Amino acid sequence: AIREGLRAFVPASHRIAHVATIDGVSFVDDSKATNAHAALTSMKAFPNVIWIAGGMAKGQNFDELVQTVGDRLRGVVLLGVDRELIAQALRRHAPSVPTTVISSGDPSAMVDAVAAAMALALPGDTVLLAPGCASWDMFRDYGHRGDEFAAAVDTLAAALRGGETS
């Protein structure tokens, strides 16, 4: 009975969900990673990460997260109202990691974030949406944020195919 239950188990959406692979770069949605600890746990699953992060930090400190996974970070794309808190931790503990800041507060900024992440990525890298923050500054909830990420990845894939839609 347990075996059948495990086989039938489907994880909830937006929890380390593979969205697509484009030109050897994997895109993973962990929009549910709404705090630094959850983002840290998510990043430990991948060796080379382009991290899309930011939102409402709710008073969190990101120093431990950046210290722990700084060697995995190939790049960071920041968005959201408290993006500067993460940027400060990166400057203190991983100053050589390329960082792109998306200043728009509109949900469509995710398209820019995904494009910026792809520009930093190499084949074999993982673009990981693990924001470490709440979503309410730009999105209805973490599900909306994850859906916007998936849509932005689809937009990028279509653009790289020459405008074809899937």
Language-model region placement:
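Nucleotide phosphate-binding/pyrophosphate-handling subdomain across enzymes
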Residues: 1-73
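C-terminal helical cap/extension that packs against the catalytic core
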Residues: 64-125, 164-166
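Short glycine-rich, flexible loops that bind phosphorylated cofactors or substrates
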Residues: 85, 133-137
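Short, solvent-exposed loop/turn segments at secondary-structure boundaries
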Residues: 139-142
